[in-house]
């Protein structure tokens, strides 16, 4: 069964990084929406469906962990991948995985594909169990 292009929300206050991420994802077969603030991202999560969310750890006035927890209360389905400048010591159930800024695009793509694949597999198993 063919799936449509996965839809990703990338949240980062660094516009250049966010635009570069969108370009890499677009070339790699993803549709990517951009948000630059927590407020903008939460509004987009409420109104749109995403297969995964990329989330910068540091956002103006808040942290990615806080935003991830709010996202999970609004829409618990999409896996959240935290993008951080250093190895993450703090853990949260709201985070599927994380990548370190500076890791190559192949790591980002591998983590995104794995997270989306796991989510789709779980949804298929839930659908089969409901028969």
Residue ranges and their predicted role:
Residues 15-33:
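Two-component/phosphorelay signaling modules centered on CheY-like receiver
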Residues 34-52:
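Acidic, metal-coordinating helix/loop segments flanking the phosphotransfer/catalytic sites
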């Amino acid at each position: 069964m063919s799936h449509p292009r996965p839809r990703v929300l990338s949240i980062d206050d660094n516009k250049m990084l966010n635009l570069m991420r969108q370009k890499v994802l677009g070339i790699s077969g993803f549709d990517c929406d951009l948000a630059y603030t927590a407020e903008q991202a939460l509004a987009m999560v409420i109104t749109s469906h995403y297969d995964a969310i990329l989330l910068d750890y540091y956002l103006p006035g808040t942290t990615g962990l806080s935003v991830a927890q709010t996202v999970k209360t609004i829409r618990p389905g999409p896996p959240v991948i935290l993008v951080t400048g250093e190895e993450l010591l703090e853990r949260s159930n709201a985070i599927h995985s994380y990548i370190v800024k500076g890791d190559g695009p192949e790591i980002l793509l591998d983590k995104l594909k794995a997270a989306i694949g796991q989510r789709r597999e779980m949804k298929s198993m839930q659908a089969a169990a409901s028969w």
